[in-house]
């Protein structure tokens, strides 16, 4: 019996599918629709087994639904802007555009050889002007709705990639791509107002019945809803300031209060801007990133002021006021009260500066003489050493009672807070979507007229410069809008913006005039099955949920808030990986075993690779 010839059969049917557009998708209201989507790939040049596994899962599901007489949409595209293309272009002396387009051609050929049931007529690429002209329209629409704004703020600065990172892109205090220790830097930045939807993003997680619990928990923790209290601490030692307000989730530990810590950007800092010691301290603080991970890993340092803060529960209890590197201005009010016995960060700070450490919470199985020793006690228990709060259980009873007393005395009020910060979207790089904004001679924001979109990236540019290559493009920067001389914004958009709405563009990929076709979107959306990595839980997946709401708010014809009905996180393909000393990754066909020895070499250079 003749062996089954895979190649012959594959070639035959793939040609048939292509010629007859077997997988072309169109609206058919006589059938149930099924929108299957895998997270689209970054065109690195070659597909790997992770891609193959991901797209095979989607292919099997799409074919199954087709056999079940569903009308299936199964598209493919390319997440093609980003820093890696810029870096690779530098290394290979190519333009990012050429490097990206060549990689797309290679990967598309590879994907087609897999015989996937993809509607290639809906193919998109985020670096094409046909895609990003619509993204620029969306930006301007959201700006008009108040969901985009610009402000000066501290940002996470990657000193290797020389760009800003969102909090979600900082992992263990390091840049998610470069691995460099992140620094704090103050810049004018553009932001999406994702915090406007904090409660809705949180509460709607309960409706995502076909999402993994792990992903929902990660998003819940990232949004970080907390219940606490705003407290006004009276201040002594200042002629100009009578009180400082702070937000805390633990007002029940006020009797263990031993210092008040302020951000270096707190309004109080203006009184120290000519103090040389404070100037040096502030510069030292810039070495710490803006994420919780960066702050947690940093050595805690403080600058002591001549001020004292008064405990609202005890007028005779006065403590020093410090500026500290672990307090950020964008959380609460840029001020925190320190209770070293029951917060490890406060404990480290108090130990360093020899401040009082007073125990006010004991474990349930300890007596009232319990004292902490070498570390803070942060568990549940019972309040002690706290006068009228003694005996209340921690945390629920004690916190409620503390807030009640503060409100009765007019010293504080209950407050709900969210950990989720607005999404910083400015990036100091060339290979990204240009922001459709300019500035007049008085630095006022001027929108690029929609009739002049897209704002295209200049070509034939030298990208081997330090910092943002667009800053050197003077001719490109200067333009006239409504008779006014203006200068273009040189930052580009975070590439996560590109992937936050691509699932919508697939629905009307061939509509050149409009970014959305409401009829197509209302038919195909939401995505019935989304497939991709769990590593995107608090990045792409959260951003996409925000974007869907923002677009819904801007377009009354689109009645949808959740983009993905079902989510499957496929896991990792675990096998040997290969990289060199410079952290460049290699495919298996680019390395060889050195005659059976326990190491591999790069084919082209014979250099050793690290096997992981």
Regions found by a protein language model. Name each.
Residues 30-31, 40, 75-84, 123-131, ...:
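Short, solvent-exposed turn/loop segments enriched in Gly/Ser/Thr/Pro and often Arg
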Residues 1-37, 66-75, 99-108, 210, ...:
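Conserved oxyanion/phosphate-binding beta-strand-loop segments in alpha/beta enzyme cores
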Residues 58, 71, 266-363:
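Catalytic alpha/beta core of large soluble enzyme barrels
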Residues 194-226, 257, 263-302, 451-479:
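Amphipathic alpha-helical
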Residues 42-73, 171-176, 280, 331-362, ...:
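Conserved active-site neighborhood of enzyme catalytic/cofactor-binding cores
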Residues 3, 12, 16-20, 91-244, ...:
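Residue patterns forming the tRNA-binding/recognition surfaces of aminoacyl-tRNA synthetases
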Residues 231, 245, 304-321, 326, ...:
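Active-site and channel-lining beta-strand-loop segments
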Residues 282-306, 315, 360-363, 388-396, ...:
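Conserved catalytic alpha/beta cores of large enzymes that bind or transform nucleotide phosphates
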């Amino acid at each position: 019996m003749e062996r089954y010839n895979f190649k012959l059969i594959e070639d035959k049917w793939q040609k048939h599918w292509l010629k007859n557009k077997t997988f072309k998708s169109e609206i058919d209201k006589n059938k149930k629709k099924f929108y299957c989507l895998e997270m689209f790939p970054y065109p690195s040049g070659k597909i790997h087994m992770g891609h193959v596994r991901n797209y095979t899962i989607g292919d099997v599901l799409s074919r199954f639904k087709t056999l079940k007489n569903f009308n299936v949409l199964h598209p493919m595209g390319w997440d093609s802007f980003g820093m890696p293309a810029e870096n690779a272009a530098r290394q290979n002396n190519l333009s990012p555009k050429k490097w990206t387009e060549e990689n797309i051609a290679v990967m598309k050929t590879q994907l087609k050889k897999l015989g996937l049931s993809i509607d290639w007529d809906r193919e998109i690429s985020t670096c094409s002007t046909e895609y990003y002209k619509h993204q620029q329209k969306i930006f301007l629409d959201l700006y008009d709705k108040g969901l985009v704004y610009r402000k000066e703020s501290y940002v996470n600065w990657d000193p290797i990639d020389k760009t800003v990172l969102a909090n979600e892109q900082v992992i263990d205090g390091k840049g998610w791509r470069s691995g460099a220790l992140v620094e704090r830097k103050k810049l004018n930045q553009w932001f999406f107002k994702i915090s406007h939807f904090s409660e809705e993003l949180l509460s709607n997680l309960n409706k995502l019945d076909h999402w993994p619990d792990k992903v929902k928990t990660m998003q819940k923790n990232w949004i970080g809803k907390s219940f606490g209290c705003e407290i006004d601490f009276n201040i002594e030692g200042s002629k100009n300031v009578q009180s400082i307000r702070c937000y805390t989730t633990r007002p029940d530990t006020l009797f263990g209060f031993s210092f008040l810590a302020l951000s270096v950007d707190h309004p109080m800092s203006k009184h120290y801007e000519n103090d040389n010691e404070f100037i040096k301290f502030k510069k030292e603080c810039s070495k710490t990133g803006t994420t919780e991970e960066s702050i947690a890993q940093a050595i805690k340092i403080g600058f002591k002021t001549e001020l004292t803060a008064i405990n609202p529960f005890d007028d005779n209890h006065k403590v020093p006021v410090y500026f500290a590197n672990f307090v950020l201005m964008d959380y609460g009010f840029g001020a925190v009260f320190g209770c070293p016995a029951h917060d490890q960060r406060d404990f480290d700070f108090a130990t360093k500066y020899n401040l009082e450490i007073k125990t006010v919470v004991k474990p349930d199985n300890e007596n009232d003489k319990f004292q902490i020793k070498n570390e803070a006690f942060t568990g549940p228990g019972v309040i002690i050493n706290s006068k009228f709060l003694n005996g209340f259980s921690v945390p629920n009873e004690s916190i409620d009672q503390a807030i009640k007393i503060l409100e009765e005395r007019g010293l504080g009020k209950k407050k709900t807070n969210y950990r989720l910060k607005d999404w910083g979207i400015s990036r100091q790089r060339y290979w990204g979507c240009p922001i459709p904004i300019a500035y007049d001679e008085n630095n006022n924001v001027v929108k690029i007229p929609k009739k002049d979109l897209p704002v295209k990236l200049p070509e034939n540019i030298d990208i081997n410069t330090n910092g943002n290559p667009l800053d050197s493009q003077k001719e490109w920067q200067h333009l006239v809008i409504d008779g006014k001389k203006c200068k273009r914004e040189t930052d580009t958009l975070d590439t996560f913006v590109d992937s936050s709405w691509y699932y919508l563009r697939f629905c009307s990929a061939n509509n050149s005039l409009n970014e959305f076709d409401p009829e197509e979107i209302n038919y195909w959306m939401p995505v019935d099955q989304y497939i991709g990595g769990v590593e995107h839980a608090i990045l792409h997946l959260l951003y996409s949920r925000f974007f869907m709401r923002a677009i819904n708010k801007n377009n009354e014809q689109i009645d949808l808030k959740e983009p993905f009905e079902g989510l499957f996180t496929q896991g990792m393909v675990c096998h040997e990986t290969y990289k060199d000393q410079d952290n460049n990754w290699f495919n298996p066909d680019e390395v060889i075993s050195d005659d059976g020895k326990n190491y591999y070499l790069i084919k082209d250079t014979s250099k050793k690779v690290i096997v992981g």
